[in-house]
Curated annotation (Swiss-Prot):
SUPFAM superfamilies: Ankyrin repeat. This is I-Kappa-B like protein J1. Keywords: ANK repeat, Host-virus interaction, Inhibition of host NF-kappa-B by virus, Repeat. It comes from Microplitis demolitor bracovirus (isolate Webb). Suppresses the host immune response through NF-kappa-B inactivation. Possesses ankyrin repeat domains required for NF-kappa-B binding but lacks the regulatory regions required for dissociation from NF-kappa-B and degradation. Therefore, prevents host NF-kappa-B release and subsequent activation. Belongs to the polydnaviridae I-Kappa-B-like protein family. ANK repeats lie at residues 43-76, 81-111. GO terms for biological process: cellular response to tumor necrosis factor; symbiont-mediated suppression of host NF-kappaB cascade. InterPro entries: Ankyrin_rpt, Ankyrin_rpt-contain_sf, NF-kappa-B_inhibitor. It holds the Pfam family Ank_2. Disulfide bonds: none annotated. The keyword Ubl conjugation does not apply. GO terms for molecular function: NF-kappaB binding.
Length: 127
């Protein structure tokens, strides 16, 4: 029962942008919670995809940072079209989020050369 409630809560918090409520769960996060954050809703989206669809700029970044801290995966692809959060941010013109995402990816991969998704780097550079 707890796993169903957690998934509903995290999905709702991501959709509504309730960062304070999300932060209130900090002490309750365990390995099982991390697995549940990667689960998909009935549309095939994770909490990260929902936060990206519903919010822009700084608000999206704050939510995504917290979800990743709890165990969500930045590289998770949407079920329907294979887009990552970075693809979604670029497609909707949220270049603040896209730039932040690129910074996160380069920090995670260090000096390893990244192969950027087609059109992402050129779209960001135009802004």
């Amino acid at each position: 029962m707890r796993h169903i409630l957690e998934r509903i809560f995290f999905t709702s918090f991501a959709k509504k942008g309730w960062l304070k409520m999300l932060c209130a769960f900090e002490g309750l996060v365990d390995e099982k919670t991390k697995e549940r954050l990667r689960k998909r809703n009935y549309h095939g989206n994770t909490c990260l995809h929902i936060a990206t669809e519903e919010h822009r700029g700084r608000q999206a970044i704050w939510l995504i940072e917290k979800l990743v801290e709890y165990g969500a995966d930045l590289d998770e692809k949407k079920h329907c079209d294979g887009d990552t959060v970075l693809h979604m941010a670029v497609k909707k013109g949220d270049y603040k989020l896209a730039t932040w995402m690129c910074q996160q990816l380069s920090m995670r991969f260090g000096s390893r050369k990244l192969s950027q998704p087609h059109g992402v780097s050129s779209s960001i550079e135009k802004r």
